[in-house]
A protein has these predicted regions:
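Short, isolated positions in well-ordered beta-strands
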Residues: 11-13
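Extended, low-complexity alpha-biased scaffolding regions
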Residues: 40-41
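Histidine-centered catalytic/metal-coordination loop motif
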Residues: 37
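Charged interaction scaffolds used for protein-protein
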Residues: 2-7, 18-21, 25-34, 49-103
Length: 103
């Protein structure tokens, strides 16, 4: 399971449509992770997507990141795994499409 510990509390990290939609609503722009601010905001959205009843605010998250930078390292490792997983699915879908085209 993908989790991050913030202030001695464990939160589930979820990369999902919900997380992307939360990001777009909060950032008031289309989903893209171009800046450090985007990354921090998406980390928060991944936490919200996995922990609907959390009382963690974005401001509290930023304070925690200042105190414990390893939180962001956990997030970047999580993102690497998620992007790798998505690339695998994309590769399988493309290969499947090529095989179907041969029929």
């Amino acid at each position: 399971m993908n989790t991050v510990t913030i202030n001695n509390k464990e939160y589930k990290l979820v990369y999902s449509v919900r997380a992307m939609m939360l990001f777009e609503a909060a950032a008031n722009k289309l989903f893209s992770l171009d800046t450090l601010s985007d990354q921090y905001l998406f980390l928060y959205c991944c936490i919200l997507a996995g922990n609907k009843d959390t009382d963690l605010t974005f401001d509290k998250l930023l304070d925690s990141l200042d105190e414990d930078p390893s939180i962001f390292t956990v997030y970047t490792d999580f993102m690497k795994r998620e992007l790798s997983r998505q690339a695998e699915f994309k590769g399988k879908d493309e290969k499947k499409g090529e095989e179907q085209g041969k029929n």
